[in-house]
Structure formats: C-alpha cells, structure tokens
Amino acid sequence: MKVRNSLKSLRSRHRDNRLVRRKGRVYVINKTQRRFKARQG
C-alpha cells in the first residue's frame, strides 16, 4: 500500500478506483487491480 499526501491523482489512474473513508483516514481501493491501494497520510 502506498502512502501519499494527495489521492486525487492516484484515483484517476484506474476507472475502478474508489475513495473510501475509514476510521478518519482516506483510502483508495480497487477490487479488480489490487496494486492501486493507497492511504492518505
């Protein structure tokens, strides 16, 4: 999982990327291409 300041550019890399908030953190998850996982931090 990558840790990035801004997830906007990471989200646009694949059309299945979803922006999710869990426990006060923002994540990018992708069910089809798992390598696009990222967390904002």
Curated annotation (Swiss-Prot):
GO molecular function ontology, one term from the record: structural constituent of ribosome
GO biological process, one term: translation
InterPro entries with a match to the protein in the record: Ribosomal_bL36, Ribosomal_bL36_sp, Ribosomal_L36_bact
Coiled coil: none
Keyword list, A-Z: Ribonucleoprotein, Ribosomal protein
Any one cellular-component term (Gene Ontology): ribosome
PANTHER family with a match to the protein in the record: 50S RIBOSOMAL PROTEIN L36 2, LARGE RIBOSOMAL SUBUNIT PROTEIN BL36B
Family: Belongs to the bacterial ribosomal protein bL36 family.
Protein name listed in UniProt: Large ribosomal subunit protein bL36
Record organism: Nitrobacter winogradskyi (strain ATCC 25391 / DSM 10237 / CIP 104748 / NCIMB 11846 / Nb-255)
